[in-house]
């Protein structure tokens, strides 16, 4: 039994190392800001502004300042690194809306030209409140293979033993400051993330300065309101995995689909919802995770619940799709 466990552990480490190598090889032509944008823009509204997208674009502006410095040799002085880091933080904090718009156009154009990002119908357009409103809703969708390669490569780098490159620490920091870290790491993994970065900070003052730097307080008022409003939902299987040790933004929306399906069980309702979404042009997969079945739409996973809403005092039956945050 011990030999089997040891073999499994070795295989896991080899797989993790392969993921690191795949990411380094496959993403060598992408800058830090582009790798970050592929992860963070995925699923965000492309036409209309939002607080979550603003956080992403501010982080992109910071990444552009930092990416040259992070790619330099370790011999560079701490004072130079610290100066660039402070410049990056200030850039993110003071970015104007017009500058945000310009950054979005630039980064989207580059990634779209490489077929790594595209605009698709936003699933929010299937929600009862938007379906017949006439409002056009579009969202960014990252290339699945590239998205997974960057995501799993970073997860392997951070969660497994061994040195963390300064560039990967920078990518993790950008995800933390823009509220994206919950998309990549579960609650239990976030404890490991904190532990690993604390270790790195003790050993190298550059990592310490990076991990202590913050620009998310620009959104602090919004996040505090969100926490007060949503905390009660954590008693239900909605928005699971929110760890308030790290900044959190409401990046993904739940969707209520109006459909009356009498005399059916949960599986029937799920099948009807899948059929409806496919007719709307969405690529939907049913993914079995433990005892439940999730819907994978694009790069995002959803739980599905039967639900009744009231509009103009009339009860309306349907299903609610709720983003799944991993525990």
Please identify what each model-predicted range represents.
Residues 1-29:
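Short, Lys/Arg-enriched N-terminal segments with co-localized hydrophobic residues
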Residues 23-102, 106:
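Short, amphipathic alpha-helical interface elements at domain boundaries
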Residues 64-89, 104, 118-159:
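Accessory beta->alpha helical hairpin/"wing" motif in late/C-terminal subdomains of nucleic-acid enzymes
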Residues 82, 296-327:
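Long, continuous compositionally biased terminal/linker segments
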Residues 110, 266-284:
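Amphipathic alpha-helical segments
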Residues 115-124, 281-291:
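Short, well-structured beta-strand/strand-turn elements
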Residues 140, 144, 149, 153-238:
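Short hydrophobic helical membrane-anchoring segments positioned at the boundary
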Residues 227-263, 270-272:
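An N-terminal amphipathic alpha-helical segment
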